[in-house]
């Protein structure tokens, strides 16, 4: 199946907690702590340093250097419930050394690290859609998850350049309500609008061609 961008009206039909998470412009982990009513822990599934940036529109024609690719899970510390899966591409050569060290040596959430650094950043409006979960979840043993999730993608800008591209997948099954069934029955488009003037096509995992 492909992915379909959600309109504002369709987003309003999501469960209240899911709407809060999708709309938050702050640190997702902090908000999820409140929504889930428990401490949230970060489980880094995969982290690797790429010498060459992937060929995606968000990074096109930019001399950005090395990329840190990070795939994580956000889970309840006590319950073990998986709430969110996330993928990030981080342009580490455009960030202060201290941030790079925290990213590579600790399990702290990216949002927490960036907030603590106090560097000036701007988060672009996120694009929200319903679509498939990333394929790497199955690769690491998560076979029994729902096939569809609410996803969002955004870029974080610092110094006039994108330094982080994050894609988050919210597991609908862990929230009380779900969007109306017609959301999954509508005509799908696998074009994703980044709201930065770029459009690109998703095929399975967002960064499958890395």
UniProtKB/Swiss-Prot annotation:
Q: What EC number(s) is this enzyme filed under?
A: 4.1.3.40
State the SUPFAM superfamilies in the record: Chorismate lyase-like
Say if the entry is tagged with keyword Lyase. Answer: yes
Ordered alphabetically, the record's keywords are: Lyase
Which reaction is catalysed here?
chorismate = 4-hydroxybenzoate + pyruvate
A molecular function annotated in GO for this UniProt entry is:
chorismate lyase activity
Which Pfam families does its entry note?
Rv2949c-like
Query: What domain of life does the UniProt record list for this protein's source?
Result: Bacteria
Q: Does the record's keyword annotation contain Transcription regulation?
A: no
Chain's role: Removes the pyruvyl group from chorismate to provide 4-hydroxybenzoate (4HB). Involved in the synthesis of glycosylated p-hydroxybenzoic acid methyl esters (p-HBADs) and phenolic glycolipids (PGL) that play important roles in the pathogenesis of mycobacterial infections.
Family of the protein in this entry: Belongs to the chorismate pyruvate-lyase type 2 family.
Q: What is this protein called?
A: Chorismate pyruvate-lyase
Instruction: Please tell me the species this chain comes from.
Output: Mycobacterium leprae (strain TN)
Q: What is the lineage of its organism?
A: Bacteria, Bacillati, Actinomycetota, Actinomycetes, Mycobacteriales
């Amino acid at each position: 199946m492909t992915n379909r961008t959600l309109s504002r009206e369709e987003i309003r039909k999501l469960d209240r907690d899911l709407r809060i998470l999708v709309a938050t412009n702050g640190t997702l982990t902090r908000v999820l702590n409140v929504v889930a009513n428990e401490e949230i822990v970060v489980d880094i599934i995969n982290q690797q340093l790429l010498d060459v940036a992937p060929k995606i529109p968000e990074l096109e024609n930019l001399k950005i250097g090395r990329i840190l690719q990070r795939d994580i899970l956000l889970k309840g510390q006590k319950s073990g419930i998986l709430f969110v899966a996330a993928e990030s591409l981080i342009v580490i050569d455009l960030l202060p050394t201290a941030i790079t060290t925290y990213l590579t040596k600790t399990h702290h959430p990216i949002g927490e690290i960036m907030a603590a650094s106090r560097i000036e950043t701007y988060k672009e409006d996120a694009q929200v859609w319903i679509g498939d979960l990333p394929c790497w979840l199955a690769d690491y043993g998560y076979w029994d998850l729902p096939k569809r999730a609410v996803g969002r993608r955004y870029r974080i800008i610092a110094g006039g350049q994108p330094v982080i591209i994050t894609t988050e997948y919210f597991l609908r099954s862990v929230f009380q309500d779900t969007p109306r069934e017609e959301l999954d029955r509508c005509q799908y488009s696998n074009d994703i609008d980044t709201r930065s003037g770029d459009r690109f096509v998703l095929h399975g995992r967002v960064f499958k061609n890395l």
